[in-house]
Amino acid sequence: MITFYKSQKDVAQALKHLIDNYWEQKIEEEDFINRLNQIIANNQDMVFKDNDFTSQVKQRLGKKRMKLILKVTEEVSK
C-alpha cells in the first residue's frame, strides 16, 4: 500500500477510498486506523495547514468522512 502521495488530490482520494472500504467492511477496524494514521503522518504537509485540514482535503472528503477522521485521530492522540 502506498502511503506517500504526490498531491493533496491524491491524498484525499486515498483517504476517501480507505474510509469507503472501512464502511463497506472490506477492511478491519484496527487495519483501518493504522493505515489512516500512516497516510496522515506521511503526508502532513499536504493534509494540514495552520493545524487544520486543508480546504481541498475537506471538500473532497465531505462532512461524514471528516467526522470519522477527526474521531479516529482524537482517539489515537489520547
Language-model-detected regions and their locations in the chain:
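Acidic, Ser/Pro/Thr-rich low-complexity regulatory regions
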Residues: 1-78
